[in-house]
Amino acid sequence: MIKATDRKLVVGLEIGTAKVAALVGEVLPDGMVNIIGVGSCPSRGMDKGGVNDLESVVKCVQRAIDQAELMADCQISSVYLALSGKHISCQNEIGMVPISEEEVTQEDVENVVHTAKSVRVRDEHRVLHVIPQEYAIDYQEGIKNPVGLSGVRMQAKVHLITCHNDMAKNIVKAVERCGLKVDQLIFAGLASSYSVLTEDERELGVCVVDIGGGTMDIAVYTGGALRHTKVIPYAGNVVTSDIAYAFGTPPSDAEAIKVRHGCALGSIVGKDESVEVPSVGGRPPRSLQRQTLAEVIEPRYTELLNLVNEEILQLQEKLRQQGVKHHLAAGIVLTGGAAQIEGLAACAQRVFHTQVRIGAPLNITGLTDYAQEPYYSTAVGLLHYGKESHLNGEAEVEKRVTASVGSWIKRLNSWLRKEF
């Protein structure tokens, strides 16, 4: 058995309200992620992204990790962990520093980003991510990479994502109870955007919505930069609950009916299609028209998507007032387990009045039969995030080695000049 650290392996772990998913990916030389292990099990002990039964969560995590290890034939020691919940919040901040030399160095960039993130965040919150949006040097704005440019003062605009300390501690505790280390906590909506969006979509303006069981995670990009993140604490489980109450069926059966026979647009359902609905209390099952089922599902999905639309409209108005690109020319990308229902893209187009697609994970090879579903978007995004961290880490080591060799040569040259 190979240890996950012996090869360029990254492990993504998503502990959602509906499922726990673990993916093992190998980083290939061309930057692709080759998925070699998958583990998944229904989630217990989670509600809307928060832990409400630690022992149950630990058991679920252990089961998913065991499956992934068995399939990948490796020993997992650490994971990139997704985090969601209504305690996640965001803010856009600005930092400014004088440029130390004539040209901007990497150190200047790090300093200005550090200045931008050194702001007061909400009480009992910690910073999860600091994501640069763009830079300005003196009077030149909209710079993507300032290194090497000349100027006197540099400004950075950044997007901060924060989370509640205790919520983060609880989910990390569940993972550590399984003998695993958390490499990094990543906002689930950000991970999903790494997984399903293209560079063109980010540039044109796009909103990705990951619809899970307990939460909808939103990330909005315009001009290639992340402008807004949000968690709405209502999602697929609300639809399941509606089905259970409307037809008097157990929640587990309601979930199965939603997944197998659900449709978010009644007009595309055939009139003679029927569904068998289990009853409670030992009563015999009943037959139900699929059209009737769609009449319960469609209004609830429309309501959920309207919550997202309200968020987008408020953001666009704010960006417009700030003079920032606010059009979402690439439309909406829906992903996550609850985005797999039939008719959702057409239902969403009626709400958003723009193009909508269902997003599945991109740029992966290997066990794609398992992982190339919207269901795994967050977990695949964690692998992409981990891959970037791996590559950046290696680049930093190379940079430090080059710098130390360079300084050694400089010292040698100055000594030679002094001596001879």
Swiss-Prot record:
What cellular component terms from Gene Ontology apply here?
cell division site; cytoplasmic side of plasma membrane; cytosol; divisome complex; plasma membrane
Q: What is the effect of changing residue 412 to E?
A: Prevents localization to the Z ring. Lack of activity
Q: What is its main location?
A: membrane
Note the effect listed for residue 408 to E. Answer: Prevents localization to the Z ring. Lack of activity
Result after altering residue 416 to E: Prevents localization to the Z ring. Lack of activity
Localization, per the record, is: Cell inner membrane
The biological processes this protein is annotated with in GO are:
cell division; division septum assembly; FtsZ-dependent cytokinesis
UniProt keyword terms in alphabetical order: Cell cycle, Cell division, Cell inner membrane, Cell membrane, Membrane
* CDD domains reported in the protein's UniProt record: ASKHA_NBD_FtsA
Q: How does it sit in the membrane?
A: Peripheral membrane protein
Pfam families, alphabetized: FtsA, SHS2_FTSA
Any one GO molecular function term: ATP binding
Question: What SMART domains does UniProt report for this protein, alphabetically?
Answer: FtsA (SM00842)
What this chain does, per the record?
A: Essential cell division protein that assists in the assembly of the Z ring. May serve as the principal membrane anchor for the Z ring. Also required for the recruitment to the septal ring of the downstream cell division proteins FtsK, FtsQ, FtsL, FtsI and FtsN. Binds ATP.
How are the domains described in the entry? The extreme C-terminus is essential for localization to the membrane and the Z ring, self-interaction and activity.
Q: Record's family?
A: Belongs to the FtsA/MreB family.
Oligomeric and partner information:
Self-interacts. Interacts with FtsZ. This interaction plays an essential role in cell division. Interacts directly with the cytoplasmic region of FtsN.
Q: Mind telling me what this protein is named?
A: Cell division protein FtsA
- Per the record, the gene is ftsA
